[in-house]
């Protein structure tokens, strides 16, 4: 969590993202170039482009994340485990695993624990859990956050990007549950400097967006750099 004061260098909080279904290899190359140029914290790409991103960013500062069970989380646990192991073997820094929202809605939290636990135990890289925060009520958010605290993931990601942006107050509530034990990555609908600053002030650690360059340019144009 950071101060709401705008005079911070945002690049270290941004994970430049390219998960659109029409993404091409050239799109990924451009994104990785931007990530190096602007010193973003990481990139996040679809599994098919993970090897390319790893190759392009080898020994560079930006980390490489890819997704598992994306975007709905409805693959079987063995399928997700295989996908996770394959991605880890290709050298990514970390995985973002879409959880089964139906299991949450049904109160089957043991299934979430077992699915994530198998992946955490099987791979030697960082594992994050993707929720759709806007589709979960307060009780569901608390229960699934507690599962994630217990199972060994390193962070929660608020959305796969299809249920709309979250509000700063949502992040404040999630941060109260997690305290400082897990990271929070906000994704979906982050387009402006003010949005980025508000979410970070509320307790987010990372921002997943395809508009990182535009946000930094907005910051620099306003003279809001460190």
From Swiss-Prot:
Tell me the domain of life: Bacteria
- What GO cellular component is one of the record's annotations? cytoplasm
Asked if the keyword Thylakoid belongs to this entry, the reply reads no
**Pathway(s) this gene product operates in, as recorded in its UniProt entry:** Carbohydrate degradation; 2-deoxy-D-ribose 1-phosphate degradation; D-glyceraldehyde 3-phosphate and acetaldehyde from 2-deoxy-alpha-D-ribose 1-phosphate: step 2/2
Q: Name the Enzyme Commission number(s) assigned to this protein.
A: 4.1.2.4
Gene Ontology process terms (BP): 2-deoxyribose 1-phosphate catabolic process; carbohydrate catabolic process; deoxyribonucleotide catabolic process
Q: Could you tell me which InterPro entries the record lists for this protein? A: Aldolase_TIM, DeoC, DeoC/FbaB/LacD_aldolase, DeoC_typeI
Family stated for the protein in its record: Belongs to the DeoC/FbaB aldolase family. DeoC type 1 subfamily.
> Which named protein is this?
Deoxyribose-phosphate aldolase
Taxonomic lineage is: Bacteria, Bacillati, Cyanobacteriota, Cyanophyceae, Gloeobacterales
């Amino acid at each position: 969590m950071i101060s709401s004061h705008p005079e911070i260098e945002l690049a270290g909080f941004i994970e430049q993202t390219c998960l659109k279904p029409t993404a091409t290899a050239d799109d990924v190359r451009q994104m990785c170039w931007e990530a190096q140029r602007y010193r973003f914290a990481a990139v996040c790409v679809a599994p098919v482009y993970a090897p390319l991103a790893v190759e392009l960013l080898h020994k560079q500062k930006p980390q490489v994340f890819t997704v598992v069970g994306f975007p709905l989380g409805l693959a079987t646990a063995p399928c997700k485990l295989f996908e996770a192991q394959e991605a880890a073997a290709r050298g990514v820094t970390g995985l973002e695993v879409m959880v089964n929202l139906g299991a949450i809605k049904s109160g089957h939290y043991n299934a979430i624990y077992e699915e994530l636990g198998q992946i955490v135990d099987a791979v030697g890289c960082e594992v994050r859990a993707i929720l759709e925060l806007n589709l979960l009520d307060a009780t569901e958010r608390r229960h699934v956050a507690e599962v994630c605290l217990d199972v060994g993931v390193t962070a929660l990601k608020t959305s796969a990007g299809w249920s709309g942006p979250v509000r700063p107050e949502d992040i404040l509530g999630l941060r109260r549950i997690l305290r400082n034990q897990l990271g929070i990555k906000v994704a979906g609908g982050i387009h402006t400097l003010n949005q980025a600053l508000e979410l970070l002030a509320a307790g987010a650690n990372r921002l997943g967006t395809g508009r990182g360059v535009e946000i930094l340019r907005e910051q620099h144009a306003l003279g809001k750099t460190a």
